[in-house]
Regions:
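Active-site beta3 strand of CheY-like receiver
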Residues: 242-248
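Non-catalytic signal-transmission and effector/linker regions of two-component phosphorelay proteins
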Residues: 170-200, 305-317
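Conserved acidic segment of CheY-like receiver
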Residues: 198-210, 214-218, 247
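Alpha4 helix (beta4-alpha4-beta5 surface) of REC/receiver domains from two-component response regulators
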Residues: 260, 281-296, 306-309
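Short amphipathic alpha-helix used as the core "switch/output" element in two-component signaling
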Residues: 237, 259-270
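Composition-driven recognition of glycine/serine/threonine/acidic- and proline-rich low-complexity segments
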Residues: 2-182
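Acidic catalytic/metal-coordinating carboxylates
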Residues: 231-234, 252, 256-260
Length: 317
């Protein structure tokens, strides 16, 4: 595959999604530069990266790669957009890493979903964060070529998309994919009654940042009775004891994923509306959630501008 093909078919959707998510989550604008080939021996780790292994027509890694100062600036902007405040100490601490992970997961999840939907012969692993060269080591093994595209952000610096190529099917004929992935994977109801403002709503996410963001959005919408759970297993216990009227739940979590929690919840309660929120998923997970009776399935991000409108569209029974 040529550099042009690798860029247009594989990296371009990630770049599109990164710019769209950057704008949606932070209000910042950016633009992509021209692709070029990096020498493997000259590759330098810049301070923060989100990595996703890929197999199939190409064996390699998609890497979204930041200088630390850019990572801090973007992380602060994501925090500000989600919860209305940000860490100002200028260091890449746990809270900023969580904000960056949310943005990175959104980009990788939406781009890989879109590529897989077009059956191009690629499979992608869930993204992982690399904070130093030791974390990066496994991803660099066997890499023969690196395609790099710089992305410039207004007043924040730049980051890079790298495609680390271990092996590629040189005979593969691939057409570029230009559209951005669907926002709604299970659409909202077309009719019904809005959920009362005093209803008990449970928000489930293993990210404290997202729990805070959901609480902020729901509170601004007038909902006053909100409880949270930090993973799928605690959500099940909370459902048993508190019996919420409505649930918003993340899919990918540390101890028990949301689709597995949904299955167990449906054994307890077949009627409570449960809307799944995720940026990292696949068609099998979506179909499973449909079968289990999910009230909706939404692709993140949810930001201050559009988040309330999206949530309101599902808060109907």
């Amino acid at each position: 595959m040529s550099v042009e093909t690798l860029h247009k078919v594989i990296l371009h959707p990630f770049i599109q999604e990164s710019l769209a998510s950057l704008k949606a989550m932070t209000g910042l604008d950016g633009y992509a530069g021209d692709p070029f080939i990096d020498q493997v021996e000259d590759f330098r780790f810049k301070g923060y990266a989100v990595c996703s292994d890929m197999t199939g027509q190409l064996d390699g890694v998609v890497l979204m790669h930041h200088y630390e100062e850019t990572a801090v600036a973007v992380g602060q902007a994501v925090q500000q957009a989600l919860v209305g405040e940000c860490n100002i100490n200028g260091e890449l601490d746990e809270d900023l890493i969580a904000a960056l992970a949310e943005w990175g997961n959104t980009i990788v999840g939406r781009a890989t979903h879109m590529l897989q939907k077009h059956n191009l012969g690629f499979e992608f692993a869930s993204p992982h964060v690399a904070l130093d060269l030791q974390d990066m080591g496994p991803y660099l093994l066997g890499v023969k070529e690196i395609v790099t595209v710089p992305v410039h952000i207004e007043d924040a610096g730049r980051y890079y998309f790298n495609l680390l190529v271990r092996d590629a099917n040189q005979d593969a004929e691939l057409a570029p994919v230009d559209n951005i992935s669907d926002a709604y994977l299970i659409p909202p109801p077309t009719e019904g009654t809005p959920v009362p403002k005093d209803a008990l709503i449970m928000s489930v996410d293993d990210s404290s940042l997202i729990r805070r963001a959901m609480h902020r959005l729901l509170t601004e919408m007038g909902y006053t009775n909100i409880i949270t759970a930090d993973d799928g297993d605690s959500a099940i216990e909370t459902m048993k004891t508190h019996k919420p009227d409505f649930v918003f739940m993340d899919v990918v979590m540390k101890r028990l994923n949301g689709d597995d929690a949904l299955a167990q919840m449906r054994e307890l309660d077949a009627a409570t509306p449960i809307v799944m929120l995720s940026s990292v998923t696949d068609s099998n997970t979506i179909e499973r959630c449909k079968t289990l009776g999910a009230h909706g399935f939404v692709f993140k991000p949810l930001n201050a501008d559009s988040g309330k409108q999206v949530l309101a569209s599902y808060l109907v029974v």
